[in-house]
Regions:
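Terminal low-complexity "docking" segments
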Residues: 31, 35-45
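Intrinsically disordered, low-complexity terminal regulatory regions
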Residues: 1-33
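Hydrophobic, helix-rich cores of sensory/ligand-binding and other regulatory modules
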Residues: 3-9, 13, 42-158
């Protein structure tokens, strides 16, 4: 299977970022730098956590990772390659909720505007839309692809 064509296909249909990811420091550090706004709010977007998850990821499972900011990633392995899909959001940005979140984590209110810009750059999608589209894309490339199960990971919520 051509990995680049698969990723382009999924990215174009859903309007979302997708990358193949190796369990090495360089690719995980790069992902963290590009996608993690604040480690205390997104501990599961860090290279350290993604390394742990990749080592323990099971075949035929979509892992939906949700952070404190309510941004989401999906990790899955297909045809001997692991992919990260996202980030994406399910709801519009709420200034009030984010102000409360920042206060509860003892972060300055001055990062609210950059946080809104960060949040608003992601497509608003539902998991069911992503699941159906990605599974159909997989079956386009490898017709006997089995159904994938779902596992939601909410990380270090207290």
């Amino acid at each position: 299977m051509n990995e680049k064509i698969f990723m382009g296909f999924v990215a174009n249909i859903l309007g979302i970022r997708i990358c193949s990811i190796a369990n090495d420091n360089a690719s995980l550090d790069s992902f963290e730098q590009q996608n993690c706004f604040e480690k205390t709010l997104q501990p599961m977007y860090t290279a350290e956590y993604l390394h742990y998850l990749l080592e323990n990821a099971k075949k035929e499972v979509f892992y939906e990772i949700t952070d404190y900011l309510n941004t989401n990633l999906i990790l899955f392995c297909f045809d001997n390659t692991c992919y990260l899909l996202g980030p994406y959001v399910k709801n519009t940005f709420s200034s009030l909720e984010m102000q409360e979140l920042l206060a509860s984590h003892k972060l300055p209110a001055s990062i609210l505007r950059p946080l809104k810009l960060y949040y608003d750059q992601f497509p608003q999608l539902s998991y069911s839309m992503i699941h159906g589209t990605v599974l159909a894309a997989m079956r386009t490339f490898i017709p006997n692809t089995p159904e994938f199960s779902y596992r939601k990971l909410t990380g270090f919520h207290e």
